[in-house]
Amino acid sequence: MPVRHIHTVLFFFCVIQFTQTLFADTPPDGNATIRRKAGNSEIVITTTNRLAGAIHSLTWNGKEFIDSFDHGRQLQSAASFDCSLPGEFWAERYNPTEAGSRSDGAGPTASSKLLSLRAAGNELQTTTRMAFWLAPGQNSSGRPALNEKILSDHLISKHVRIGFQNHDNIIEYKTTFTVPPGEQHTYAQFEALTGYMPAEFDTFWTFQPETGQLKPIDDGPGEQQLPVILSTKDGKYAMGVYSPEQPSPGFEHAGYGRFRFPAAKVVKWNCVFRVRNKQGIPAGEYPYRMFVAVGTREDVRQALVALVKKF
């Protein structure tokens, strides 16, 4: 068979396989656990069917780090797009979300669809077809949803590994967003990773790469350019995020966010990337690499020092 015919056959085989995966009727089991020793304890990460394979729990040294209440408060990923509309951008109006939709509430099922999951030892890989956060006809702060269906054609894949080089308390976290063809956008906002944490993680810090020290920061809300750490007051428990790929071109003063929601009794950090293209956001894959450090506040500081030296 001529080479060009082989390439054509392989291309159509891949398209067929992707389509079969996207529209598979029976999802894989989303209940999984990975773990690895870290210090005198171990980091344990748990996913659930309820959240279409998103991370429901992360524990270390007897402490839960994730506030998994509805289908938005997890360790998870989401994306937002402008639908090429002028004027104000409001993220939740077109907002594919890994763990499910707002309407899923605290219920037992997700509108998102888990397509694949592999978990072994300290390593987890998943692919999920994301639901829109808003259902058609719903609104966010008076701004109506732009999507016309609840289940999007956007995919999120993650590859999570507990431990990085000689650092047991660093979690390497890779995400790949797949933007489908046929959509028209000029602005994309990828919340590559966010962590919703219990309210007791109530002190916020930035990591200063030049000195390796931490500096207190107010609760914003919003983003700035330095890695963030959320900690308990006594410093015994903390979580921080760092990405060597920050900042996004043209958005040098953003990337790491921190938020406090007193009424909901939850706090949040995120790591956000942005793409703006007046000619249109191309369909395809958008990969990002991040590192999440867990432990005492000092453990997390030392982990970020090591990461900055590495990258």
Question: In which residue ranges do the predicted regions lie?
Answer:
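Bacterial N-terminal signal peptides
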Residues: 9-19
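Active-site/ligand-binding surface loops and adjacent short beta/alpha elements
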Residues: 192-195, 200-261
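Beta-strand-rich recognition/accessory modules
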Residues: 25-41, 46-48, 237-311
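Amphipathic hydrophobic-ligand
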Residues: 146-157
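Beta-strand elements of well-folded, non-transmembrane domains
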Residues: 130-132, 160-164, 177-181, 292-296
